[in-house]
């Protein structure tokens, strides 16, 4: 109160002198009229603003890369500011002239900012996913809600770079140390470490360990009356949600469905299988999705083919006369989804572009596409159409309800569950599980599941969501269950990965395959050990980072031409004689 009174008294004195014409506004004799005098002392100079920005970014980085809650950034930022005050960062005891230099650390800091953004958005940073989406194409993506977050991240990163540049220019101690800091930031960036590890493996390893484990999928024998196949991918609906202590009843409807199914517990996620396209390829082709990289024939165009070098579930069933359909509410142009299914035996590939024009309520869509209650209604119609045809059929369906970060709960769920707060992923998990159970029960009532194997699986483990801390607190595994007339309901504890789904599904359909294997997968209905069981998840991931031969197999046919192009073959003119030509020729004289 005393300081405020003194400020007001000083201001009154200055105003009186000004009115008499004895002082000039904002002169040193009248400093009380300067705007900075009315601000708290830390706010009168850019020093503390710059240090605060750096501290908040440090705190956010620590909170994002550890299991600290978001508010954990506050003590980290506070500790940074205390150190800054103790060591007078930005205001050295022995000032040096300000030098207009550009810090060496700007690029390393920006790369760390990119890594933190990816970690905050997706939970686990998968460089394979980044490279694949860049090559496969990202048009018609539904992540519009992430654009705003990306803009905020970019602006805050620019503010951080400006703040750090200011600190280096005004404090000579930071100028001396920041080159070492740049090296430390580069060496410690996990994203760059992964790239460097991959490059070193290409040079030092033979890169063919997984290739030697690969078994080409082959059907040796087929049942007399092969069953139909309904494969339901539930977006990000991992089996981890079945833990009632952590997640309540969010997974309860799938648990109820599992009472009449073969339920597999312990289906883990290996590297390069942790996003939708990678999860579908792992479960249908028995391989991880290793990006094409330099094997892509045109680096500036989207992929024209997706894993053309291996046979997948669709190829095997198509060769056996199956009519195959893919259905999903999102665009099939995103991440090469449509290309993959069309190239691997599917007759009909139906996504947002094909399904949305026929909707009765065209406004009832989300940023990705159709809601799942609409998609499942159309799925029933497609199954009726397939049933009217002769021969076996297969239908692959991909949901959207559980998509990170918040999910897209359908209208039917909102009417049943009440208001959605827009954040709680467990609301969306319950919705997805209930919709899947309702679809299966509806198909059973209509008799559309006779002689049909139903597969319910998560495409991959979820990315960062509101329940992230609870999810990463223990072991995580994927959803995988089989429902069929010939299958005895039971629970099987396995050590497996999503690559084991392909041979398991084939054997559940009654097909005989070579050594119970297909791709890198092993049938979980057999006694054969899986790669995860034999070698462990860590070893498998380490081998995957070293692999080059399997990558070449996956993308066989996309290699750019090596060396100079071959010279064109000379054109040989072909002369064709007609009877008329022969008549004009002089007859050969006889001796």
Where is each model-derived feature located?
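Detector for intrinsically disordered, low-structure N-terminal pre-sequences
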Residues: 1, 23, 52, 73, ...
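Low-acidity, Ser/Thr- and Arg-rich intrinsically disordered low-complexity segments
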Residues: 3-6, 10-14, 19
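Alpha-helical transmembrane signal-anchor/signal-peptide segments
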Residues: 198-213
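Solvent-exposed soluble domains appended to multi-pass membrane proteins
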Residues: 217-234, 239-591
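Short, Lys/Arg-enriched N-terminal segments with co-localized hydrophobic residues
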Residues: 23-33
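Transmembrane and membrane-interface helices of multi-pass
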Residues: 5, 35-202
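Short, motif-level signal for alpha-helix interfacial/capping segments enriched in acidic residues
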Residues: 90-93, 97, 211-215, 437-440
